[in-house]
């Protein structure tokens, strides 16, 4: 894992290479994951490694942004997140209407606001709608909420002196099959939980008692109904606002809360080291045979974590929303 250090203007200011004690690099398909780098506290690094600098790799287009730097006992520990973290510092005040295309509507929201330095949105044409109304969020929250709802990925990449946010959704490749029996992965953990699972939101808006405004968000999809009460009294109907518009805002709150209370089926596994980043990558759909559990699953690679230390890299892959075929 060869690293480079960039300043806030994306000028390369140091070639770190593999001259670090350890590095943890994690990326999510439509989430923002963590980064940590530990180095010997040389005079050069103490001078150059600062918060809001960026770290890149020779083998990936993505970046990490440093948010915290600690110096102690002759070492520097720089930690941060994927570069998409900076989108949390850009606000959107307004409304994206139901049916708007995810990529173009978020790009428009960003371009009409206070742009982040050296960050643009790439031109994409996914033609994937977000079928709910959403208002008044950070640009990062727009990306996370809309993309997670519709299985779309987003990432910030570097292209010379500019960063670009791009949206993507790889199609299913039937040739991407992994199994312990094939020798191309080992299962680290499997977890299935309905502890916090809810699929039917009862959203309570303005008013009191029997006059309390109610809307319903049904995500049961044929499953047993699991109710979630959502107190949305903070969302008040505005002057001259239509019932349809107000209901849409309440429904959007219900969708957000249901996303926070889903059934979890997670599977973490370690792939054959040379396959990841070559045969498949973040966002690709894998077919995984879990022979010990009698399960075949299909899911996107939702997150990967790579730990580099002593010239060895350990890669762990995690998958997200899963289609189970028993």
PLM feature spans:
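Polar/acidic, low-complexity leader/linker segments enriched in S/T/G and N/D
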Residues: 1-17
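Residue-level signal for glycine
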Residues: 10-13, 60, 293
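An acidic/polar, Gly/Ser/Thr-rich interaction patch typically located in mid-to-C-terminal regions
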Residues: 18-45, 185-326
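Short, ordered beta-strand-loop transition motifs
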Residues: 24-33, 68-76, 156-161, 308-311
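Amphipathic, non-transmembrane alpha-helical segments in extracytoplasmic/periplasmic proteins
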Residues: 28, 37, 80, 93-120, ...
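Surface-exposed cap/loop segments at beta↔alpha junctions
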Residues: 42-120
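Glycine-centered loop/turn motifs
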Residues: 48-55, 179-182, 283
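Short beta-strand-centered interaction patches in the first periplasmic/extracellular domains
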Residues: 70-77, 82-87, 122-198, 202
């Amino acid at each position: 894992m060869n690293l480079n250090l960039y300043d806030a203007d994306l000028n390369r200011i140091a070639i770190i290479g593999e001259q670090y004690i350890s590095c943890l690099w994690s990326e999510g398909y439509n989430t923002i994951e963590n980064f940590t780098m530990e180095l010997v506290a040389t005079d050069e690094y103490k001078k150059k490694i600062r918060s809001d600098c960026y770290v890149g790799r020779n083998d990936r287009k993505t970046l990490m942004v440093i948010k915290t730097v600690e110096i102690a006992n002759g070492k520097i520990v720089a930690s941060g997140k994927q570069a998409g973290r900076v989108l949390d510092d850009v606000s959107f005040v307004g409304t994206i209407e139901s049916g708007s295309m995810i990529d173009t509507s978020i790009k428009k929201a960003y371009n009409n606001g206070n742009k982040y330095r050296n960050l643009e949105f790439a031109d994409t044409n996914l033609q994937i709608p977000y079928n709910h109304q959403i208002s008044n969020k950070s640009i990062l929250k727009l990306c996370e909420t809309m993309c997670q709802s519709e299985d779309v990925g987003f990432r910030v990449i570097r292209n010379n002196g500019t960063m670009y946010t791009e949206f993507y959704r790889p199609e299913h490749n039937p040739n991407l099959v992994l199994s312990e029996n094939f020798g191309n992965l080992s299962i680290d953990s499997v977890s299935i939980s309905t502890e916090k699972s809810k699929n039917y939101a009862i959203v309570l808006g303005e008013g009191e008692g029997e006059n309390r405004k109610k809307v319903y968000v049904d995500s049961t999809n044929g499953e047993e109904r699991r109710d979630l009460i959502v107190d949305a009294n903070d969302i008040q109907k505005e002057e001259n606002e239509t019932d349809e518009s107000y209901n849409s805002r309440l429904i959007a709150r219900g969708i957000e809360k249901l996303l926070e209370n889903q059934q979890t089926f997670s599977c973490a596994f370690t792939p054959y080291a040379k396959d990841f980043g070559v045969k498949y990558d973040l966002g690709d759909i894998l077919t995984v045979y879990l022979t010990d559990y009698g399960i075949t699953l299909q899911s996107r690679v939702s997150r990967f974590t790579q730990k580099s230390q002593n010239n060895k890299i350990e890669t762990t892959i995690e998958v997200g929303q899963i289609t189970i075929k028993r």
